[in-house]
Amino acid sequence: MAKRVKILVVGDLMLDHYIWGSCERISPEAPVQVVKINNETYTLGGAGNVVRNLLSLGANVSVASVLGDDEAGKKIKEKLAELNVKDELILTEKGRESSIKSRIMASHQQVVRIDKESVVKINLEDELVLKVKENLANFKAVLLSDYGKGVLSEKVCQEIINECVKLKIPVLIDPKGSDYSKYKNATLLTPNKKEASEATNLKIKDKAELEKAIKQLKEELNLTYSIITISEEGIALYDDKLHIFAAKAKEVFDVTGAGDTVLATLGYMLANGADIKEAIKIANLAAAVVVAKIGSATASFSEIEQLLNSSFGANFEHKLKSIEELEEILSQKGKKKVVFTNGCFDILHAGHVKYLARARELGDLLVVGLNSDASVKRLKGEARPINSQDDRACVLSGLGFVDYVVIFDEDTPLNLITKIKPDVLVKGADYKGKEVVGSDIVKEVRLIDFVEGKSTTGIIKRIKDAKNDDKK
């Protein structure tokens, strides 16, 4: 859809540190949870998430920043190297603390977050500006990702913006704080409604107030375009009048990092020569992709194209997960209630659809465990399944109320339930009075009535009877 253009990201690089564990008791020393650590993961945060989004879109990315001479700074450089992003424009400031946010995660919940960072202005302003200016002509767009940690001071912002204006390079900014004067003359900013309200001292409660605020930002800061992201409503643009581009999200699971995705996509599209309205439309689609995922996600152009071309807006193949992938995804679910059910779903019929729709109503995410072909044969006989596990998974993924499909090979889903630990376990009403596998692991078991006269066995019998009638 677009070319591999060179884009520069300047801003506050951070390290997101996740400590994954389980909590099974309260400490005898104080009324706090005891977390047993299982593993730890690191990922790029702050401006690093903008870098990740640009790479996902296909850009050739460089990053300029200032880090401390500490372990977190070294780890950030390691994570950039893993992504093949060079650190030649990153300076090291002695005595400065690199930003690291450590989150302790237990039983799918964030227990606590611990921040270690410097938020004072960097001492290497002149050196950073010089580095950027020396390389600026190589880039088709510059993105300033401001998280208020001291890298993007007024001097740094204005020197970079003014040089970009001279070279006619678009400079896009995700702003921070209430004083936007340091962003004057930029191509555009991407504040959300709350941030724009604080920057303009205007309460944005309706369309008229939105237009007043967005116009004020454009005029006071001499922006080429004025943009305000308005969450589930989409993106507002002011050129000579107000335009609102409706959001494309069908389902919203997590808005974490959506602002970074919008900034990255707008920058990428403008760098490729798109006009601002086309860029916003694609940014809306990219945001729809990431909010349908959990955690700080990214959107690729293949995902955007699938969403653009699909009348359902569904990305079927991305619903099918391995047990390991699903375990990691659900560990970041936050307060969302996960519902689980399982079955063969060999020939999907109206009874299945109504059953699954009712199951989804019991929570926020519906995970369907699907018996593998080998598992179905053991349970139903050599003549089954009629449809392969891949075909059955594809059909289930096409249902809007099914969030994830996971194939398991055992006769029962006990191992799967043990690993993903859903909140609600759903079975058919025929399990009344029987032991439900996994009931001791979940918080709640719900039984749902089947639709009378609807069954896979019945459908197969009718097909066979019809064939026999044809032979007579």
Curated annotation (Swiss-Prot):
Annotated region described as Cytidylyltransferase, given as residue ranges: 340-472
One of the protein's GO biological processes: ADP-L-glycero-beta-D-manno-heptose biosynthetic process
EC identifiers of the protein: 2.7.1.167, 2.7.7.70
Catalytic activity: D-glycero-beta-D-manno-heptose 7-phosphate + ATP = D-glycero-beta-D-manno-heptose 1,7-bisphosphate + ADP + H(+); D-glycero-beta-D-manno-heptose 1-phosphate + ATP + H(+) = ADP-D-glycero-beta-D-manno-heptose + diphosphate
InterPro entries linked: Bifunc_HldE (IPR023030), Cyt_trans-like (IPR004821), PfkB_dom (IPR011611), RfaE_dom_I (IPR011913), RfaE_dom_II (IPR011914), Ribokinase-like (IPR029056), Rossmann-like_a/b/a_fold (IPR014729)
Any one annotated GO CC term: cytosol
Coiled coil: none
Pfam families reported for this sequence: CTP_transf_like, PfkB
Ranges for region Ribokinase: 1-315
Domain of life assignment: Bacteria
Binding-site residues for ATP, renumbered to this chain: 192-195
Alphabetical UniProt keywords: ATP-binding, Carbohydrate metabolism, Kinase, Multifunctional enzyme, Nucleotide-binding, Nucleotidyltransferase, Transferase
SUPFAM superfamilies: Nucleotidylyl transferase, Ribokinase-like
A molecular-function term among this protein's GO annotations: phosphotransferase activity, alcohol group as acceptor
Active-site residues annotated for this sequence: 260
Listed pathway(s): Nucleotide-sugar biosynthesis; ADP-L-glycero-beta-D-manno-heptose biosynthesis; ADP-L-glycero-beta-D-manno-heptose from D-glycero-beta-D-manno-heptose 7-phosphate: step 1/4; Nucleotide-sugar biosynthesis; ADP-L-glycero-beta-D-manno-heptose biosynthesis; ADP-L-glycero-beta-D-manno-heptose from D-glycero-beta-D-manno-heptose 7-phosphate: step 3/4
Membrane spanning stretches: none
Keyword ATP-binding: yes
Assembly and oligomerization: Homodimer.
Free-text function comment from the UniProt entry: Catalyzes the ADP transfer from ATP to D-glycero-beta-D-manno-heptose 1-phosphate, yielding ADP-D-glycero-beta-D-manno-heptose.
Family: In the N-terminal section; belongs to the carbohydrate kinase PfkB family. In the C-terminal section; belongs to the cytidylyltransferase family.
Record-given protein name: Bifunctional protein HldE
Lineage: Bacteria, Pseudomonadati, Campylobacterota, Epsilonproteobacteria, Campylobacterales
